[in-house]
Amino acid sequence: ESSTPVQAIYNITVEPNTTPDVRNATITVSVKEHVQEINVEQAAYIQSDEPEKYTVRENLTTHQLINEMGLGINLGNTLDAVGDWIDPSSILNYEQAWGSPVITQEIIEGYAKAGYSSLRIPVSWGNLLSDDFKVHPDLMDRVEKILNWTLDCGMVAIINIHHENEWIKQVPTDSKAKEKFTSIWKQICERFEKYGDHLLFEPMNEIGYDEIWTPWSGSEADKAKALGYVNDLNQLFVDIVRNSGGNNAKRHLLVEIYNTNLEYAYDPLFKMPNDPANRLALTVHYYTPADFAILGGGEVVDWGVGRESWGTEADFKELNDNMDL
């Protein structure tokens, strides 16, 4: 008879405890004359008074959250409007400068009622920024008010830095620009640290280095340099957020590929940032076919003529081929 011990593994599952009381049980294991009792305890269910907008779900993957986001819309031409002709005495002057009405709770609720489940809130923080890179409290308050309207509708929100590419592009090589980028993101992180899974951060918008490299000009070394700068920006952003307080340690984040162009997502020169939380997704802007997505119907330019409709067999094939990359 062999004396080699035999190991058996059994998985025992029970229904979740939905009562306010601790549940106890004893599991008895017997093999021949050997009997072993194991006492187990199931914690009581504690109903949290914390609103859902402050909740972080420990086991929620970023992929699952992206699926929750569903159909989204961009709150463009509002908090991201820029221009040296805009009267800086009120944040609402920026909000209306490009033709938008003042954003109201009813507008945000209207998006939700129309079927949108996520809202991107682009912000040009530099509009009201002090010389020592402090965001004006009126702008921060306004962003938070719109954010709360969004979250209270059950929508997912995205906040970024928008329309400030000129100085953001200098961050990898200029210490002052890096200080500015770091300061803005630290303030965003501090202000919104209590918010949960339904708030994502995005570092910037459509950053590219055409002066260094484009698909039509420049060497492979130039391309590596240009894409490398965007990699550096992404990593700096992730590091800032993860080293801040509150729920930011586990916040789901978006990071950018070069020019947010889909084809660079699978370019070997693109590097996903190191993230201890492993909660990252790529943001991609898809303007294909350009004669429909960019040009107006009948508009004529040197590279094409705008069309008013989309949905041909060729259109679907192109879309499906790109999404399968």
Residue spans for each PLM region:
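An active-site-proximal structural segment forming one wall of the substrate-binding cleft
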Residues: 53-55, 98-119, 129, 133-163, ...
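Acidic/histidine-rich helix-loop elements
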Residues: 76-103, 131-135, 173, 291-318
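A short beta-strand micro-motif common to beta-rich folds, especially ectodomain repeats
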Residues: 10-12, 21-33
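C-terminal edge beta-strand
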Residues: 34-46
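Hydrophobic faces of well-ordered beta-strands that scaffold small-molecule active sites
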Residues: 69-75, 119-121, 157-161, 199-203, ...
